[in-house]
């Protein structure tokens, strides 16, 4: 038997020493002061924090929607790595692909296009990122995937409806189906139940828990301790840093 130590798996997604300051004219508003975290394949990670603590900013940087600061000439404001590769070093085209294919986004507000049907909203981001041929075959595959998700989420009878005809919980289900239609490696969820009543919010969390059991990795930011209890692991964001302890 070998005495060699077991290899440590590369995290699926990790942030190391991420720093972010917003500038409003001459005013600087520091938000993140060296935040670090990692999420493994198939893990549900909750990041707890009060309103204004920088949770959304951290999530946006993880997903490539925002960038960490540049600090000095030879240093930067931290690094985000996906499967060991720094996303800050990706070309614009590769970064677009990362956001479109590897990451699914769910927000507190649903951001559905009012003129499109439920199924059209669910397939839109996946179709936008597709260029390979044969186009018709790929388009059909994406549509079938979206319909399967919507049916699993209890919206099979709503496929042709417009967002204005849906309840808040139904709209969030469409948003989740849209986020998962491209089979992303990880779902980034920003207060996904924050705009819903407790019962409907619980139903949304049940839905996410089922997708997690199917192997989906989730990073969810929230201020609700009850939601954090659903996760495999919980971290706390305070004073711009991530802590493993709930106590300051």
Regions found by a protein language model. Give the residues of each.
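ABC ATPase NBD coupling module
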Residues: 26-29, 87-104, 139-140, 213
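Helix-to-loop junction immediately C-terminal to a conserved catalytic motif
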Residues: 63
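Short coil-to-helix segment of the ABC ATPase nucleotide-binding domain corresponding to the Q-loop/switch region
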Residues: 116-129
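Conserved ABC ATPase signature
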Residues: 162-166, 170-172
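Conserved catalytic motifs of ABC-family nucleotide-binding domains
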Residues: 183
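Catalytic Walker B motif of ABC-type/P-loop ATPase nucleotide-binding domains
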Residues: 187-190
């Amino acid at each position: 038997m070998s005495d060699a130590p077991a290899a440590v798996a590369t995290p699926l997604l990790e942030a190391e020493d991420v720093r972010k300051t917003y500038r409003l004219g001459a005013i600087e508003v520091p938000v993140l002061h060296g935040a670090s975290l990692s999420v493994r394949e198939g893990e549900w990670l909750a990041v707890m924090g009060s309103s204004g603590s920088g949770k959304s900013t951290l999530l946006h940087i993880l997903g490539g929607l925002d960038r960490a600061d540049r600090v000095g000439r030879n240093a930067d404001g931290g690094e985000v790595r996906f499967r060991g590769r720094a996303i800050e070093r990706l070309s614009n085209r590769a970064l677009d692909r990362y956001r479109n294919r590897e990451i699914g986004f769910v927000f507190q507000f649903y951001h559905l296009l009012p003129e499109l049907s439920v199924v059209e909203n669910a397939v839109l981001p996946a179709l936008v990122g597709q260029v390979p041929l044969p186009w018709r075959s790929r388009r059909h595959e994406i549509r079938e995937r979206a319909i399967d998700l919507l049916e699993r989420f209890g919206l099979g009878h709503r496929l042709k409806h417009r967002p204005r005809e849906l309840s808040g919980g139904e709209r969030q289900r469409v948003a989740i189906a849209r986020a998962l239609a491209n089979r992303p490696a990880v779902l980034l969820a920003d207060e996904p139940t924050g705009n819903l009543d407790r019962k409907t919010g619980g139903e949304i969390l049940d839905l996410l828990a089922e997708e997690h059991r199917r192997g989906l990795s989730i990073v969810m930011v929230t201020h609700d301790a009850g939601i954090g209890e659903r996760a495999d692991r919980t971290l706390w964001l305070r004073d711009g840093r991530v802590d493993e302890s709930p106590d300051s």
